[in-house]
Amino acid sequence: MQDLLNEILDEVRPLLGQGKVADYIPALGGVRPDQLGIAVYGNDGQVFSAGDAETQFSIQSISKVFSLVQAIGHSGEDIWQRLGHEPSGQPFNSLVQLEFERGRPRNPFINAGALVICDINQARFAAPSLSMRDFVRRLCGNRAITSDSKVAESEYQHRSRNAAAAYLMKSFDNFHGDVEDVLRSYFHHCALSMNCIDLAKAFGFLANQGFCTHSGEQILTARQATQVNSIMATSGLYDEAGNFAYRVGLPGKSGVGGGIVAIVPERASVCVWSPELNAAGNSLVGMAALEKLSARIDWSVF
């Protein structure tokens, strides 16, 4: 596996320079674009990594999976009364579909859906940001995980569209908390700084029927883990879930920080990171690396 990861990174490195770092979030725009890392965490507890796998980056929308898992953990099926689990077919921050469907987001991985999940968690936890941080620390076994306050503040200062979505949902009685408080929590979640190894380990439970190997915790039931994986497969890559399924063939979740996490059910979790994004907002080189890895080991679930 180690030789394979090194080989794959060498093969995709020539693609560096073809994408663009997410500069619409000012604090992310200064990230060095030529970085590339990958980590694989097996269900047996083994970790393999290559490249810049220990370099921290902003996980951004990957955090939406952690928020969803938290909500399922304390509220179960009740959360689906407030949002769906269908692909949206619209931009991740679209307001048009949200109004047409009367404030009920299509799924938890578009921004409106993630805000509803955050609203649900906000009502459950006294300190939602700390609760999320501690949850992620537990999942990856790294007590040093923190949220980058500069990134969170940068996103908060450019919150207008997310605030509009929240207030629109509130007008349909599908958003119950204080909008500004929920947005603060949401951006702190997105601003968590992790590396490929941290994220591969943190997502290991989704490859292992909901069981976290290194902590010994049953995070979700096997059925719930399967359900989360199914939503990742259909809605985890912005408007490129179909292309990711075609090329990589695994449940996945991406973020505009350049990270992509992929789940190989019953076998492993993988995280790849390269900050240059394609037109759909996903890591250009990261997707190419996952495509090669999945093909070489025949990991596609299809």
Curated annotation (Swiss-Prot):
Pfam families: Glutaminase. The keyword Cell cycle does not apply. It is an enzyme of class 3 (hydrolase). One of its GO terms (molecular function) is glutaminase activity. It catalyses: L-glutamine + H2O = L-glutamate + NH4(+). Keywords: Hydrolase. InterPro entries: Beta-lactam/transpept-like, Glutaminase. It comes from the Bacteria. Its EC number is 3.5.1.2. Substrate binds at residues 61, 111, 155, 162, 186, 238, 256. GO terms for biological process: glutamate biosynthetic process; glutamine catabolic process. Gene3D superfamilies: DD-peptidase/beta-lactamase superfamily. Coiled coil: none annotated. The keyword Hydrolase applies. NCBIfam families: Gln_ase, PRK00971.1-1, PRK00971.1-2. Homotetramer. Belongs to the glutaminase family. This is Glutaminase. It comes from Pseudomonas savastanoi pv. phaseolicola (strain 1448A / Race 6) (Pseudomonas syringae pv. phaseolicola (strain 1448A / Race 6)). The gene is glsA.
